[in-house]
């Protein structure tokens, strides 16, 4: 009986850390004709109607007219790790609003803004900027192409950019800095905070 409980706990922890997988490899290949060009501006509208514009840089994205660190969080409302970390991301955003902005991109589901608001934002206190747009898929494809990520995409999946460049991040499983350009699965705000401080000090 003890071994069964241990296995169940192990599987639950593994799923929380590894994220929700769509069971499809990232085979999307952006061509020159459909990829973003340097200087392109993408205006996003949040699920509550606020606006944010990101600008395509040579190798990434940045917030228009802002030098804030940008985190892009690819997630789904149904994803348990996404739900679990949402209130912590909200708290981190509130505490660091002067230097940091998170943009959440809904992925792998076709839902309307009201559904996201009622079933994610209100339930999990996720009132940071969430875009539920047809443009999301193209932005995500561009991100994965930028960082040469060719594996199956699991969510939550995050990248962090400063001055339009993807930043090296800690491994969120053990906290060591390994040079990944992404967080895969649930990540603690302690790790995010350490990485943000490091990025600010380096820049």
Describe these PLM feature segments:
Residues 84-125, 137-143:
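Structural microenvironment flanking redox-active thiols in thiol-disulfide oxidoreductases
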Residues 16-19:
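C-terminal motif of bacterial Sec signal peptides marking the signal peptidase cleavage site
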Residues 72-79, 107:
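Aromatic-flanked redox-active Cys/Sec active sites in thiol-based oxidoreductases
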Residues 43-70, 94:
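A short beta-strand-turn-helix
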Residues 120-163:
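Short, internal strand/loop/helix patches
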Residues 153-203:
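Thiol-/selenol-based redox modules, centered on thioredoxin-like
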